[in-house]
């Protein structure tokens, strides 16, 4: 599964922090498979990667998420998690909230 996470400008795969969409510096693309992170890559824009992405994780439930849903991407929201490592751990245990209409 591929997961987009909007992050700050740190390129640290474990410690980059999630950012609001209007504050993001780059996108982290996490390849998550069999309960673990296989790889993490960083992109300035989502358009730089043109393959199907399954999920996007947003910083809060007030973010503008409808465009992602219209693209067929499942939208999740963190509770208290901040770093990529914390978010992927919460993803593994289904501890992220699902956004809906």
Q: Regions from the language model: what does each represent?
A:
Residues 1-47, 52, 85-101:
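Non-catalytic interface/targeting segments
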Residues 49-81:
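Mid-chain, well-packed structural core segment of small domains
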């Amino acid at each position: 599964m591929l997961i987009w996470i909007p992050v700050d400008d740190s390129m640290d795969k474990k410690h980059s922090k999630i950012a609001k969409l209007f504050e993001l510096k780059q996108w982290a693309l996490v390849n998550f498979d069999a309960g673990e992170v296989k790889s993490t890559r960083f992109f300035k824009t989502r358009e730089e990667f043109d393959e199907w992405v399954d999920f996007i994780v947003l910083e809060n439930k007030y973010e503008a998420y409808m465009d992602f849903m219209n693209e067929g991407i499942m939208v999740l929201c963190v509770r208290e998690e901040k770093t990529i490592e914390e978010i992927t751990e919460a993803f593994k245990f289904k501890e992220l909230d699902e956004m809906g209409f």
